[in-house]
Design a protein with these regions (language model features):
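Short loop/turn motifs that connect adjacent beta-strands in outer-membrane beta-barrel proteins
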Residues: 39-50, 85-98, 114, 129-135, ...
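Cleavable N-terminal export/targeting peptides
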Residues: 1-46
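Residue-level signature of outer-membrane beta-barrel architecture
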Residues: 83, 126-128, 168-170, 208-210
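Outer-membrane beta-barrel "beta-signal"
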Residues: 78, 197-210
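Transmembrane beta-barrel strands of outer-membrane/channel proteins
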Residues: 50-60, 100-106, 138-144, 180-186, ...
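Mid-length scaffold segments of soluble, non-membrane domains
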Residues: 105-139
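Sequence/structural signature of outer-membrane beta-barrel proteins
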Residues: 59-65, 88, 105-111, 127, ...
Length: 210
């Protein structure tokens, strides 16, 4: 019984630690700008600097990472809308802007099943603009996800997902910039149905702004 209890605690500890890190990042992203800029400069409704972005890439889950048991490979297509919240935040190396990303990702599952998963993500993002052409950024958030795929261990079609990661934007042309991203991605049904074996994945994406 003691050994079993320790195993259960370890599984929950891994899941809770990942969730805690994600929530902590979101709190930083969402609250920091309010302390760094004057409220008069906030442009919550202004969409003049908003833009559309499109990304594509590859993702893979790793058995043994947390409670993940299946190796699931996906081709990811991610159209998204980037809404500027605060511009010209901070100074020096951390000068940048704060935005909200709204994504409608399509995950084309290529293994072990051939099917799709579709989600809706709301991500907080901070982009560093001190560099001349390269602009790194951090992001985190999540949302609902529906799975058409038959993946062992996923006991529900409706799931939740959260993710966080880092990326870089490179100035190519006046209206088209190159995007490169690496992100951690978690999918589970939150215990609403059994079985509930989550997918802990890494994803690499490239894209363009327009």
């Amino acid at each position: 019984m003691i050994h079993r209890s320790l195993c259960v605690w370890k599984r929950h500890a891994v899941g809770n630690s990942v969730g805690t890190v994600c929530v902590f990042l979101l709190i930083i992203f969402l609250l920091c700008p309010f302390f760094l800029v004057d409220s008069a400069r906030a442009a919550m409704i202004d969409t003049s600097k908003d833009r559309w972005e499109a990304l594509a890439g590859y993702g893979q889950s790793f058995p043994g990472w947390g409670e993940t048991t299946q190796r699931v490979e996906t081709i990811d297509l991610v159209p998204r809308y980037n809404h500027l919240i605060f511009d010209d935040v901070g100074s020096g190396w951390y000068r940048g802007f704060h935005s909200i990303l709204v994504e409608l990702p399509v995950h084309v599952v290529v293994s072990p099943d051939v099917s799709t998963m579709i989600g809706l993500n709301f991500l907080a993002c901070y982009t560093f603009t001190a560099g001349e052409r390269w602009h790194p950024y951090l992001f985190g958030g999540g949302g609902p996800l529906y799975s058409f795929a038959d993946i062992p261990g996923m006991g529900a079609d409706w799931n939740g997902n959260y993710q966080f990661g880092l990326g870089a934007e490179y100035d190519l042309l006046e209206k088209h910039n190159l995007l490169v991203e690496f992100r951690y991605h978690h999918i589970s049904n939150g215990g609403s149905k059994e079985p509930n074996e989550p997918l802990n994945s890494c994803k690499f994406l490239i894209g363009i702004t327009f």
